[in-house]
Regions:
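Residues in short coils/turns that link rungs of repeat/solenoid architectures in beta-rich domains
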Residues: 107, 141-143, 172-173, 196-198, ...
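Right-handed parallel beta-helix/beta-solenoid
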Residues: 38-59, 77, 304
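Residue-level detector of bioactive/disordered segments in secreted/extracellular proteins
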Residues: 12, 44-45, 55, 121, ...
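N-terminal extracellular ligand-recognition/capping segment immediately after the signal peptide
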Residues: 54-58, 62, 67-97, 101-111, ...
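N-terminal secretory signal peptides that target proteins for export/translocation
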Residues: 1-20
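Glycine-rich beta-solenoid repeat tracts in large extracellular/virion proteins
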Residues: 61, 83-89, 112-131, 147-159, ...
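Bacterial N-terminal signal peptides
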Residues: 21-35
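All-beta strand scaffolds that present successive hydrophobic residues in beta-strands
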Residues: 73, 93, 97-100, 132-136, ...
Length: 304
């Protein structure tokens, strides 16, 4: 996973070159083979791990989790050669934070998923409870994959992510897969722009009492899907669903009492709901196609 950055390069100093800039104690530590602090202050910021000071993003992530410190992504492009796995199980009780200054994670060349946020150690019968994952700032993620570009939680629901917060996540999957897939997220607050050239932009699989906003599109598919597991008591607000054949599809029989506040649909087919109960659209707007006829969509109520 090679990192290519626009800013904050790390020094590659020899011991002789370092002598002019660092104390003798650090030089002695280097000569003794002991790991010393980097000479540049921006490669050793207080209380955070600077990803630009590592040869690859996976190593930086592992170091941040081990140190129980936020992972800082300075502005720049981080090119992956394999999937970035963020397994914050060691911090399941207190959470893990990523601070992004408009960084771009680019997995386009791999053909695989770009990023998986997970919490190992559970099972489908006994999911591991994990808390307080947070992406602060704006983070861009690019992929070209048949998988979801960003997956939050294992597909088998073996990790339950509680009280996550994602400030501003922009995901673009140029392949046939999903852009963003949410698996077993509870009491989350997520703003995502989920764009796919393929089957679905934003997919909610077992999401409960969470707040979701942003935008979703899928050129050859469905902008937003609620399709597996128990998804209920969610508020989806100020969301833009467009550039897709279908705006919203609800196929899970356990999708109940979700409220869409002022959603905007700009797709040939705005809504296709075949399952669920008491899912409400409050004050929806339609930019293309016709609003669904009253009573034509299973479990969907519209006001006004």
């Amino acid at each position: 996973m090679k990192t290519r950055l626009v800013k904050h390069p790390c020094p590659e100093a020899t011991i002789a070159g370092a002598a002019a800039r660092v104390p003798a104690a650090i030089i002695a530590a280097v000569l003794l083979g002991i790991t010393a602090s980097p000479a540049r202050a921006d490669c050793n910021p207080a209380e955070r791990i600077n990803a630009s000071c590592y040869s690859n993003l996976q190593d930086a992530t592992t170091a941040a989790i081990a140190a129980n410190q936020p992972l800082w992504l300075p502005a720049g492009t981080y090119v992956l050669n394999r999937e970035l796995v963020i397994d914050y199980a060691p911090l399941a009780a207190t959470g893990f934070q990523i601070i992004s200054d408009g960084a771009i994670i680019d997995a386009t060349a791999t053909g695989n998923r770009a990023m998986s946020i997970e919490c190992s150690g559970g099972s489908p019968q006994d999911a591991k409870g994990c808390f307080y994952f947070h992406i602060q700032g704006t983070l861009f993620v690019n992929a070209n994959s048949a998988q979801a570009a960003v997956r939050f939680g294992f597909n088998d629901f073996s990790d339950a992510h509680n009280s996550a917060k994602i400030d501003h996540l922009i995901v673009n999957n140029a392949g046939p897969g999903y852009a963003v897939r949410l698996n077993y997220n509870l009491n989350a607050d997520i703003f995502a722009v989920a764009v796919s050239a393929g089957s679905a932009g934003l997919v909610m699989d077992q999401v409960q009492f969470s707040r979701i906003s942003g935008a979703a599109s899928a050129t050859r598919g469905t902008a937003m899907r609620i399709e597996r597991g128990y998804s209920f008591a969610n508020t989806i607000q100020a969301i833009d669903l467009e550039v897709a054949q279908i705006g919203l599809a609800i196929t899970s029989p356990y999708a109940n009492r979700n409220t869409f506040v002022s959603p905007y649909f700009n797709c040939p087919t705005a809504i296709l709901a075949t399952a669920g109960n008491s899912n409400m659209l409050l004050n929806p707007s339609y930019g293309a196609g016709q609003p669904p006829a009253p009573g034509s969509q299973t479990g969907v109520l519209t006001l006004p």
